């Protein structure tokens, strides 16, 4: 009997841990504002990375690339069904209609930032590699999943 209880407790624990606690505990407003803040932070860090790469300050740019990568992973949990509208969201319905595609793009953007941190060590054209591995992901997402502004 004790073993059955432990198994049930374990299943319940795994079930609840499979959902990101912070996203479940937040209000719709907090989720929408949180994702907007992360995207804004990514953009600001992207601009800083451009400046640092232009100045050949590669090592200073790498932590910003890691931060952007981490934000993209976190953003996967910031688009629950109940956050399609409100609080000046610019997210289009296509996010939820094509959730797998959107999630794949967020994961690719995250992975590409890690690739960028490695690629800058040997790249001859830093601007081109940044465009390929960073800005092109922004463009791909905005053109498909963000309202024009």
Pin down the residues of each PLM region.
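N-terminal signal peptide c-region/cleavage motif recognized by signal peptidases
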Residues: 18-22
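Sequence context surrounding c-type heme c attachment/ligation sites in exported
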Residues: 28-149
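Boundary of Sec targeting at the N-terminus
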Residues: 24-26
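Bacterial N-terminal signal peptides that target proteins for export
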Residues: 2-12
